[in-house]
């Protein structure tokens, strides 16, 4: 597996990320959208690259402008999840998909975790040629989404 840091241009400042390439024949690509206030090197982005590359997929994870809770840019401008907007997040995902297309990987599989899962559904609607969508801990939606919790049986003791 080959790993390299990447920079994705936007209308403001570039988005940092990482691209993992399999050591064998490339069969496709996958683009990962991280959860709220997370980043490209935490959570599922720590174990997914190896699994995706084993399947022959190039795997890209990147920071949206709303990554982490709060930071500063150029030692002055406050940035991060505390200042993010959904419109900016949707745009960042589109920038990343465009960057992948420019690298020769059009229409990647989309993986979205939590808030990234919510954003990924919009991305797939906007990009109908997307071959697959994988939701990781995204909101459950549907008729029972607003019911009281406790019936999910999330713990081993349940």
Show where each model-derived region lies:
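A catalytic-pocket lid/entrance helix-loop region that shapes and gates access to the active site
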Residues: 146-158
């Amino acid at each position: 597996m080959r790993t390299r840091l990447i920079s994705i241009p936007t209308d403001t400042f570039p988005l940092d990320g990482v691209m993992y390439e399999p050591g064998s024949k490339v069969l496709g690509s996958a683009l990962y959208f991280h959860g709220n206030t997370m980043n490209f090197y935490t959570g599922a982005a720590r174990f997914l690259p190896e699994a995706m590359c084993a399947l022959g997929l190039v795997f890209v994870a990147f920071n949206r402008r709303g990554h982490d809770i709060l930071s500063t840019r150029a030692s002055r401008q406050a940035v991060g999840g505390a200042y993010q907007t959904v419109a900016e997040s949707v745009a960042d995902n589109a920038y990343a998909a465009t960057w992948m297309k420019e690298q020769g990987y059009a229409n990647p599989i989309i993986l979205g975790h939590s808030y990234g899962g919510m954003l990924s559904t919009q991305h797939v609607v906007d990009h109908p040629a997307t071959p697959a969508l994988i939701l990781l801990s995204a909101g459950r939606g549907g008729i029972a989404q607003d019911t009281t919790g406790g019936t999910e049986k999330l713990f081993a003791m349940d």
